[in-house]
Amino acid sequence: MIDRYKHQQLRIGSVSPQQIRAWANKTLPNGEIIGEVTKPYTFHYKTNKPEKDGLFCERIFGPIKSGICACGNYRVIGDEKEDPKFCEQCGVEFVDSRIRRYQMGYIKLACPVTHVWYLKRLPSYIANLLDKPLKEFEGLVYCDFSFARPIAKKPTFLRLRGSFESEIQSRKYSIPLFFTTQGFDTFRNREISTGASAIREQLADPDLRIITDHSLVEWKELGEEGSTGNEWEDRKIGRRKDFLVRRIELAKHFIRTNVEPERMVLCLLPVLPPELRPIIQIDGGKLMSSDINELYRRVIYRNNTLTDPLTTSTSTPGESVMCQEKLVQEAVDTLLDNGIRGQPMRDGHNKVYKSFSDVIEGKEGRFRETLLGKRVDYSGRSVIVVGPSLSLHRCGLPREIAIELFQTFVIRGLIRQHVASNIGIAKSKIREKEPIVWEILQEVMQGHPVLLNRAPTLHRLGIQAFQPILVEGRAICLHPLVRKGFNADFDGDQMAVHVPLSLEAQAEARLLMFSHMNLLSPTIGDPISVPTQDMLIGLYVLTIGNRRGICANRYNPWNRGNSQNERVNDTNYMYTKKEPYFCSSSDALGAYRQKRINLDSPLWLRWRLDQRVIASREVPIEVQYESLGTYHEIYGHYLIVRSIKKEILCIYIRTTVGHISFYREIEEAIQGFCRAYS
């Protein structure tokens, strides 16, 4: 077996019978070797204990309870002073019960059986390696016909094979009837070969290097012939060349991995550990078993039925033996791959049995679901939608998901606040969705970040941390700027949410994984949280303003004698029918909320003197003088009021409400960023 502390990789391949025995065999103190499963039984119906030498035998697979044998005796696990290591009465080893997750057994087959993956899967490795049609091998494996051995010294009727092929074909079903079991074995071993044993002999005979050389020579000869002028023949030659290439690659693979081709025929059938094919007791005392157990039982029944006449009986007809070998082959095929290129086997409720191939392949198979990816607790999954009102570091969790993810924390809060006396009452309050539950949930979520992950996670920005808040609905809300880091779109994409439990995980999420801490691409350093699509359109509409410019209106805002453009004086702003003046951005936004001005209407906003906006070489468009000596220099986008001594009294900039809103958002973001790092 593979040591999990030393090996970081896994290779899957065919196994020799010696290795299968080494995995399963154990030697008892009395010298008895155990490991072979010989009985098709599981548990005794009275004692509810595993049957000896059955599919759940404690001698073969280990004890059900750690350190307790089948007799009920107890030994301390790992104590070298405790002796013996095996129970003298039942032969069960005193070890941890977890051994039943990896301790294997085996079934000794009465006849060789081809592995259905290598025979019926396309392309068929056996047919490719031996360069014969697949139908011939299927007929040979399932005992539909036999072939003569070339080394027969005392032929009986097969010497007539060349001349009387049709006659022999008509008698192939009647000839075995004249032989008893012993006589048929002698006849078959001497002159004919059938079943998987015939395949095994053919796989063991040829040299792989000779196969490679002959195939390469034939491929070169076909390539030198060129086109024949017949399209059908050319296609046939092309298919033959492709087949030879596959055959060469297959032979080289066997040579490179040092695997013997005859391993594609099974003599020993491994039995999975019991914990991987469990029998579970459900409500009402009923038992629910894995389908693989039933398929193993079927194999053992048929194998024992074949073993009995081969070892004891001397009068069983040879036809019966061949028929039973076919049944064993079909039982093993069903165990390994039920329904491969045929009708699957079903139970009494017309349900298809789940074979070993069904357990390991597909999205819900052992590899993709359990080994390559695992389902974990404290996690959920839902569709993502835009949350435009969210902060960059926040995400919206639906109430249904949040109460499940933080249920244990809510239960602890209910018990601490003496709202519930135990876990059962707390869960009932959560099911009833009482108001106190949502209050405690919000308190828990305030100090607990969550991790959002979108598959495939190709770089570190594929999983980021957020501060969750409760939202209505069933979708996860996200700030649109974090979309690019996840490579997500709001068109039905789904994301997984995880809750970091340990303090170390929470600290890592806060310091390294928060979305506002990952604004730059880790590969090239460019900003990755940049506005796109509708965000750019919104910013464009917000800041486009009125493009007429200041020269489009020759109105003098400081001329109080102009009766057509009256000004309304107020403590905070001066408003005209043309372009109003405001002392602060808050006054301008207040006027917009009161619908006195539009989003893109030009206005004059008083600016701070410490923030200079004057270009060094810019010349004013117009200069206006007042009677008190002050004058106004009007530029394209700002206005300066100066005293008689040319001192700047105040500055007004020409802007819009959209520009003011955009500026305030950026200013608040920068101030918040500075406070976070101060």
Curated annotation (Swiss-Prot):
GO MF: DNA binding; DNA-directed RNA polymerase activity; magnesium ion binding; zinc ion binding
GO biological process entries: DNA-templated transcription
Enzyme class: transferase
Residues bound to Mg(2+): 489, 491, 493
A Pfam family that the UniProt record links to this protein: RNA_pol_Rpb1_2
Binding site for Zn(2+): 69, 71, 87, 90
Cofactors, names only: Mg(2+); Zn(2+)
Gene3D superfamilies in UniProt: 1.10.40.90, 2.40.40.20, RNA polymerase II, clamp domain, RNA polymerase Rpb1, domain 3
Family: Belongs to the RNA polymerase beta' chain family. RpoC1 subfamily.
Protein name per Swiss-Prot or TrEMBL: DNA-directed RNA polymerase subunit beta'
Organism listed in the record: Calycanthus floridus var. glaucus
